[in-house]
Design a protein with these regions (language model features):
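Basic, Lys/Arg-enriched alpha-helical interface segments
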Residues: 1-62, 71-79, 86-106
Length: 106
């Protein structure tokens, strides 16, 4: 299957992924690729009008990569992932959503 969109990882995401153990990193990358071809809220979920999250559960740990749609290029659909966290609470921290919105404005 062809990907529905391209994913661009910013430096903060790469640093986050490099800080994880290999199995967790592999699972997140697998889920990123899978989210490009299937429509599944368990993998890629809208948080508000502008912010989305890539979701991964590995060994009872919830990982989130925050992202937004880049609509500047009319020929290609791109999702830009801004940063990642290990989610420790039920609700997504507002500061993480705000961080994504700030990066989006740059």
């Amino acid at each position: 299957m062809n990907p529905k969109f391209k994913i661009e990882l910013l430096e903060d995401v790469n640093e986050f992924l490099n800080g994880l153990n290999e199995k967790a990193r592999e699972k997140i990358i697998y889920n990123l690729r899978k989210s490009q071809v299937v429509n599944d809220n368990d993998l890629f979920k809208k948080l508000n009008d502008n912010v989305w999250e890539f979701r991964t559960l590995h060994n009872k740990t919830k990982y989130r990569l925050f992202a937004f749609w880049d609509k500047t290029d009319k020929t290609e659909t791109v999702v830009i992932s801004t940063h990642g966290i290990e989610k420790k609470t039920q609700k997504t921290p507002k500061k993480e959503i705000q961080k994504t919105e700030q990066i989006m404005k740059q």
